[in-house]
C-alpha cells in the first residue's frame, strides 16, 4: 500500500512539471440592484453569484448548501424569477434586480410569507428557510391563489429535512390568504429590532468565518 502511494506521488510530481498554472481571474466591477439598492463591488470575473452576494454585498441570508443546485437554500430572485445562486455566474445577472431573503421584509417588519412561516411552523432548524421564502414569494407574486400542487411545484427544488413539508405548504397558503386580503397578518412575536450587523462582511464585530 505504501509502495503504491509512493509510485502515485512520483507520477504526480513528474506530471506536474508539464502543467502550466492557470492565471487567477481578473477582478472586475460587478453592479446590480440588490434588494432595492444599487450596488457596485469588485469581484473575480468568474465569481458565482452566491459568493458575490455573501462575501461582497453582505447578504448573508443567502445560504451555501450543496454547491450543486440540489438543495435550494441559495435561491434568490433575479428580475422576479427564482434562481439558484450557486449555479449562476455573477456576470450572467449583472445589472439585474436581485432579491434575497433580506429584501422581503418591509423595513424591520416581516413580510406575510415570513410571518406565516413563523406562525405555522414552516421553519425548524432554519437553514433551508431563506430559499423556501424566496421560492414561495416568487410564486405568490404571480399567483395569490395557488393550489397545494402549485406550491409543491414551486418548492420542488428546495429540500427540508425537518418539517415534512406540510407546515411549509400551510405557511404559504396562509401568506396567500393575506395577499388576497382575506385575513390579517399574524401579530409580530416581539417588537422589531434593527439589523445588528448592518455592514455585512465588513462589520468589525462579526464572528470569524461569518461570510463562509
Indicate residue ranges for each PLM-predicted region.
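Signature of N-terminal electron-transfer/Fe-S-associated modules in redox systems
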Residues: 2-195, 199-212
